[in-house]
UniProtKB/Swiss-Prot annotation:
Function: Functions as a component of the nuclear pore complex (NPC). NPC components, collectively referred to as nucleoporins (NUPs), can play the role of both NPC structural components and of docking or interaction partners for transiently associated nuclear transport factors. NUP188 probably plays an important role in NPC assembly and organization.
Keyword Transport included in the entry's annotation: yes
InterPro entries listed in its UniProt record: Nucleoporin_Nup188_N (IPR018864), Nup188 (IPR044840), Nup188_C (IPR041634), Nup188_N-subdom_III (IPR048883)
Gene Ontology molecular function: any one: structural constituent of nuclear pore
Originating organism: Chaetomium thermophilum (strain DSM 1495 / CBS 144.50 / IMI 039719)
Family matches, as PANTHER family: NUCLEOPORIN NUP188, NUCLEOPORIN NUP188 HOMOLOG
Protein name per the record: Nucleoporin NUP188
Amino acid sequence: MATLTDRTYLPPLEDCLTGRTVILSWRLVASALEDADLARLTSPALSTFLRDGFVHELLKHPARVFEPKDLKQEFETKTSSIQTVAPGVDTIKKDALWLADAVAINQVAALRIVLIEYQTRAHSHLVLPLSTQDVANIQEAAGVGDAHASSILSLLNPASAVDAETMWCDFETEARRRERILATYLSERRSFTAAVDALVTFLLHSAPGQHKDLDSLRRALLKDAFAFDEDLDVPDRSKLLTMAPTYMNLVEDCIARAQALPAKLGESFKTEAFELDWLRTAITEAVHSLSIAFQALDLDTPYFAPHELLSEWFELMNSSLFLESILGFEVVADLAMPARSLVSAICLKMLNIDRTIQFLHDFDYPDGEEPYLLSSQTLNKIHTAVTNAVNSGVAASLPVAFAWSLIVHQMHLGYQERAERRDLLVNQRAQAGFELEFQPSASTPNRRRRNSAGSIVSLEASPYDDFLREQRLDNDIAPVEQIAMLATSRGQVYQVMSEMALCLGTTHEAAFRPAVGARARLVFQDLLKRSAYLIPYQDEPVFSLLAILATGRQYWDVTDALSASSLNQVYTDMLDDETLFTQFTMQAINRFPYEFNPFSVLCRVLAAALITNKDKADVVTGWLWRTPTLTVDWNPAWDRSYELCFEDENTNSFRLTRDVDLFGSASPARPRHLAAEERFIIPEGTLGRFVTDVGRTARLEFEHSALALLGKRLEVKAAEEICDSGMAPLDVDEQAEAVAMLATVLRAESLKSTAKGGDPEAPLKFLKEASRLLPHNKDILTVISDTIDGLVEKELLELDGPQIAVLASCLQFLHAALAVCPGRVWAYMSRCALIAGDARPGRLSRITGSLDMYAERFDLLSSAVKLFAALIDSAACSAVQRRAGSTALVSVRSAVENPWLGTSEKILSRVALAIAQAALDVYESTTTWRFRSELDRSILVRDVVGLMHKLVVHAHTLSSHLTSTLSPAAAHIISSFLTPPPSASSLRFQPLLGTLLVALITPRATLYPGQSRILAERVTSVLAFCTSLLRAADFLGQTHIPLQTHLFQSACLLARLPAANAVYRAPVLELLRALVEVAGRAANGSGEPPSLLGYLGSHAARSFISLVEGIDKPFGRVEHAVVTWRFFAAVIRNRQQWMAGCLLTGRTPREALKGGGEQKIERKVGEGSVLAAAMERLREVKSLDVQEAVAVMDFVVSAQNYWPWTIFAVRKEKEVVDALRGYVRGLKAPGMVMKTDGAAAAAFQARIAAYVAETFAMQLYHMRQMRQAEKFAGELVADLDYFLREGVMVWGYNASLHGNFARNFAKRFPGVEVDDFKRTMWLPRELGKGYYYALEVAEQMLGFDAGWGGVKQSGFRKEMETANLNLSLVEAQVSLFHAWEYLLLELTLSLLPKKENAAFARQVLQVVEQCLEANQRSQPPENIFVVLGHARAGLALTLLQRLADANQLPRDVTHLLALVSSAIHAVENPFGANDLPYFRTLLKILFVVLRAAKQGTAKPGESNVAITQQVLTILDRVVARCFRALAALVHEQQQNATDGTTTAPEDLALITAILQACLSVPGIEQCQVQVLNIMAAHDVFQVAVALFSWADRLLPANPSPASSSTSTSATNPASGDPVYGELALLFLLELSALPALAEHLACDGLLGHLAAARLAGYMRRTNVGPFAENAGAARCYAIWAKCLLPLLLNILAALGSTVAPEVAWVLNQFPNLLQSSVERIEPPGFSRPTLSLASTPPRQKFISLLEISEIHSLALLTRVLAACRAQNARDVPEVTWDGAKVLECVEYWLRGRKVLRERLVPLGPREVEWRGMVATGGVVGVAGDGGEGCENRLEEKAVGLLVGVREVLEGGLEGEGE
């Protein structure tokens, strides 16, 4: 067998000191085993730990854990320098050696404890008392001047608070560190035995089949550690029995340690607090050891324990007086009862009274069993221990003494019986010998050997005879009888057992787990069973037995949770065990209702406990339906109604001679005084018997319904009628018990009816049976309501404790009835005086208004709050059922049986509001009431805060009207906390604050799990409520500053809660996340939000971050890790700069400032930072859980977004980058993932890929700024396969799934739509089954219908889950698209400019095609897909532009052009308000592609023809059609702009640009006739001319500031902006580029129309120019220079001299413009100003490119016209334009290039861009110009035009000269 190593138990020192491995302390193991769901138990770390063989040895030999063995050599090996080089190891070694010597343990164990303290130092710091700064914040939050805050502030102890810095310095000292080490040592000792105790309970008593991993772990541990077989059926008893003596020895050691402190421990450490902790630790260890020993003994049932074990045990009990030697201190009072209970249980278990009595009756026990009765020595020790304890008055010994007296009594009887038989036999032998003397001697030889049977030898003395003789009990049993009398006098033993049963029960007062308690109570039950033959049926044993069964359980403890059958044995034995059933159960039945409580309590307890055992539960309810006997006080009125019978038997039997009415006269006629009710008649002939000698109590053999009888008696009690009855009226206690029993049984029936195979009608039948004897206008619910009304209306002073108990029981009954007849309960609550009504205040506050909250008042208040919560739940969950009405709803219940029919929504809303008001009253009073214990306060705060939380959640989870009835109540709660009056702000917050303080000051306990659970539930309820309030305020847009301020002030408490209990970690982080998010959004635009780190303080913040950055190590629960990472991301995103810096750098601001220096930036990411932890996880991103991976990536991406330096920090971690690249490189197609792992896995995969893309994009962006991106971008290209496949095509949406689901849902649930379950955004949505539709709400609302679950779970629940998963996938794919878009844009900027990246260019073009193809597919109508389509189009446009800029577009664009065209044609309403932006984007894409087509195709044949045909189609279906439509819309817009359609001048400009691009495509010039026909078919020419003619009255929908509104802007272009005139001429200008079209324009009289237009008149004005003061004049100049002159040129070029006269005539229509063009070109100082009407006023001489273009066009026109005039001077008029002067000016500008550069002004954004671009070198200075090369593109273009003007003019002048 391999040697066991402790590597798992104590990991290597290096890993522990660096934090790579967290030691699994026994405290962590114990806390994990305390979890209700045992979720942490299946974590890999803990599972490995528990399966470790070394740990198994420790479990079986607990003394080895802290044994004082010298392991110095092993210690040195573990701490040697070769094992670790981490700093601080010397201190660790010194502390370990000190601890080992101080408390006498081995060095290795001490080392483990010191390392645990080292790793939990942040916990230790956070659980220190609050600093003065923290106390000040808490006082401010509580309201220092508020009298109600005194109870809360008293918990702070402000006088002892010290400064945070002083506290930290003290915390770092050696003395404090060693105090913490000692505390850790004691904690580990307590936790070890607690962990073993919990583990043994889990192994032996957990119900199998609940969780596969748990079952596997349980089997492995039972097999490996305790030698069970594979089926867990045949355990090795020897292994089990060794645990009992082992842990009993540990108890002995605990007793010794409890009586003395460590001898070598320094005196400075022996403080009062340490002494108390030492004592409590020893006792706690003893209690858990006792529990382990008891469970081991219990598993050995029913065998005798070895007599050696009994001998040792009772010797220990004798020496310690049943542990009273260490339990007699007040400071350990809470530990005393658990210890005493287990001591008694173990003693009784060892005495084994059942088997002992059987043994004393000659029971044959199996071979190998050693009864302790065979050892007189053991018996003597038992007797001595019991006698001494009883004589010393030890209460724990009384049950043992009682059992021992029964055993010794039986021994004495056996001894006396054998003695009498021996004496009788001796006498018989003596007489026989005397007679033989007279017989003849001759017969002697013939005598045979006699049979020895019955001889004295056969009556041997029993082994215990020696014990009896030694103790002188052989003849005198009086000493033992004295012991029994001491035990039973005044019912002491029964009282003790009742108290122990409470400690061993299942309520919050129980000290142990239910399994241990149930088995221990079974031992006490056995004792009562065995004593039943000696002690008659009487109050003490009966009520002790009921206490053992009930253990304090009340109505609210009823549950249908499954439990192991062995745990229910204490209940089932009341039915199955013959003795118990005969002596107790049947006695209680037969004495009912004369003795009321035993039977009622028995039914109540058994009905509640046996819910999951249907057969047994039916037996109990059967007693109530068919009670066999009726025991009553005989009414004298019945004296003539019976006759005696069976007189010879002297049994006092009788027979009724007439019918007897139990609630009326007994006359033969049986008058029907109430004809409308069924009467309780005992028929004639019924047999009975008088059962008492004194009094006349009779038991009638009359089977009846106890339910109906109870209902009648409650009615009589409620009405306070005086009835001639055979039974006395119920007293108040009986009334309370009766109602409680009915409520409990009804609740049990309701729970059973919902279980598989249950009867849905059973609860209703129960109510009907209880109402059977009532008048027909009443039922049991009416009786309960009348009872409440009668009690509530009484004055406060008249209500005593029992009456309040009745009221509480009635509220419990209403709660039980709520599940059966909710409409009735709501109707009653609307008129119940407990809560406020329309014109009355609620009386609940009056009844509970006293400061002293004694038991009955507390029960009433708790019951009321729980009832209110159930009412709110029922209102929320029944929303669909109430709307079903009387329609034929196919469900579990038919429409006729709908319990909500007739319920008014108004009533529900009004009652809910009253409940909210009552809840607030109770909530505010919880700080002032004096409770019996803080536990009661915790229960009430938990319930009332939970009620308010439910209201907020129910009202805001859904976006529909389904929960609108709760909206007023929720609004009342929210407004009370968010916008309270100034005086009530702190008052509202005090109970919440008190909860946080109580959670911090309450120490962790390994006992009383119920109390720990209640406190945890209280705290988590408060935290969840605060979170919901913040979320609701943010969602509703309400102010939340008061609550936000209080929470920030309480941040020091919130940060400490996870250190107090790990259960609080997740809810605290959720609250802090909501707090920083809401505060960050509220502070937008109004300054910085409050600083979380500022309120925490630097030291507390550092400890808090250290605590939570462990991300639930070592358990690694995914849900906790996700919550933690989301909190970190929220801090990063919401302007918590200081806290964010601490997360990212691992240093507080103070530490960062101390670092300083030049290396500050390089050292920002510390080893212990959260960012470093994130990158550590991302190194293993492939193996990381997908949910945690999403959360980690979200944090990293947020850090890079808000803190750019982190981008370089991530980039430096090459392993992280490589891991992310490898992750996306290995991703499978979502379709494959869905088939293998489901839609959720595909969604998370896509979301992670999106985050990875964002990360790479941000890295590329910042690297590009440093010109380092090209290499990384090139590497990434190889990893883009997943993005290229899935980045654009959001194919996940399953339209048929959602359509069919919505249709089927509406058909199944009339009046309700599936969208009614759409989740609001008040809580962040999470990918998964509950993403879009609130599945948990639907489960509550629709669970009543059979179709919701469906056959084999295939109903609407499954469909909703599938729909949510599908929408999760869509959401993830949309995120993937946007991230891919971001990454792709960065890649194109880095790679496209390089020609060698042609392969990447093809990939980019592939993405463009994917975008266009995706948009042409059928899209769902949801807005998200509309937005997505627009985004795809935008991405395609950007990519095409970048491809074009890089000259990377393909030469053959046929396919691309076809895609764009089909995408454009697919737009149904291109100029609709929703589609117009998208249509514009497509037009821009078309323009870019057409520009690429202008370069020609690779093959001049077929492809050219195809492109030409496509271009012609575009001209027809896009250009001409859109131009006409836009022109019409412009006119309509001007008249009526209410149709929602808004066009812009840019649209016409875009169409013109497309026209230009189309006409530029090679080969289109050969299709002029087709183009002309297309344009003519759409009347484009006329439309353009009309648009120009109306331009002065058509203004753009969104005018620029320069052309903004004046009253005359619609008719005066001098003040408006006639932009449409320019656009119309530009469109005609592009058409005129084709000669055929230019000729058509001229023939249609275009020039005449232009000259005659109103706009032409404005163009003739003198203020027209490029630098005009208003937009109209500037636009007129643009029309002249950019449109009219080029248009005239095109027409002149097309028609030549034919049109020259008309062109010249048009030019002469604008003499001012002709003259001003010459003046504008003049250089500064070129000529003196002249007084001329046509001249422009003097101005600062600047020149623009448009002005140069103007003279260039005029130069060409005038020269061509001059040539025509030379041939035909008569027809062609002269155009007056000073060309010579212009030439002179041009020469000047060309020679003075510096002046030109200074005076050249850009007019538009494009020219501004040219000015910033370097010149291409295409135009340089000409020799003789005296100038140099151009510096920018704008200058270059201007020089080119000037050179062109010079060439034209010089040529013209030379010709003239010639």
